[in-house]
Amino acid sequence: MSNFSGFTKGTDIADLDAVAQTLKKPADDANKAVNDSIAALKDKPDNPALLADLQHSINKWSVIYNINSTIVRSMKDLMQGILQKFP
């Protein structure tokens, strides 16, 4: 499982750029795993083990990108709420 170390060390992540940077490596790793699984299927497209590995890689990729999207949306909503309270 990917390590979201920026969120577990008790450090403050106060801006959207820091959040995006923290999530970049797990997203890149998941993307690479999907691409590697697809490349492995080119030689043996009917291998059940390789198909299962691709399914797992795609599921992991999907979860990581959903987490990324949710966090970015939450940060946007938080910042928008703060800005709306200013006169």
Swiss-Prot record:
Keywords: Plasmid, Protein transport, Secreted, Transport, Virulence. Changing I82 to A/C: Shows no Yop secretion in the presence or absence of calcium. Changing D17C: Shows no Yop secretion in the presence or absence of calcium. Changing V19A: Shows drastically reduced NF-kappa-B/AP-1 activation. Changing I13C: Exhibits constitutive Yop secretion in the presence or absence of calcium. Its main location: secreted. It is found in: Secreted; Cell surface. GO terms for biological process: protein secretion by the type III secretion system. Changing V34A: Shows no Yop secretion in the presence or absence of calcium. The secretion and/or polymerization may be controlled by the type III secretion system regulator YopR. Interaction with YscE-YscG chaperone prevents premature polymerization of YscF/SctF in the bacterial cytosol and is required for its stability and efficient secretion. Interaction with the needle adapter protein YscI/SctI is required for YscF/SctF secretion, needle assembly and Yop secretion. Disruption phenotype: Deletion mutant shows no secretion of Yops in the presence or absence of calcium. Deletion mutant has no detectable level of YopN secretion, YscF expression or YscEFG assembly, but it expresses normal levels of another Ysc component, YscJ/SctJ. One of its GO terms (cellular component) is type III protein secretion system complex. Pfam families: T3SS_needle_F (PF09392). Component of the type III secretion system (T3SS), also called injectisome, which is used to inject bacterial effector proteins into eukaryotic host cells. YscF/SctF forms the external needle filament that protrudes from the bacterial surface. Essential for the calcium-dependent regulation of T3SS and Yop secretion. Required to block Yop secretion in the presence of extracellular calcium. May be the extracellular T3SS component that senses extracellular calcium and/or participates in transmitting the calcium signal to the cytoplasmic compartment where the block in secretion is initiated. Contains an N-terminal secretion signal that is required for secretion. Belongs to the SctF family. The YscF/SctF protein can provide a protective immune response against lethal plague challenge during subcutaneous plague infection. The core secretion machinery of the T3SS is composed of approximately 20 different proteins, including cytoplasmic components, a base, an export apparatus and a needle. This subunit polymerizes and forms the helical needle filament. Forms high-order oligomers in vitro. Forms a stable ternary complex with the YscE-YscG chaperone. Interacts directly with YscG but makes very little direct contact with YscE. Interacts with the needle adapter protein YscI/SctI. This is Type 3 secretion system needle filament protein. The lineage of its organism: Bacteria, Pseudomonadati, Pseudomonadota, Gammaproteobacteria, Enterobacterales. The gene is sctF.
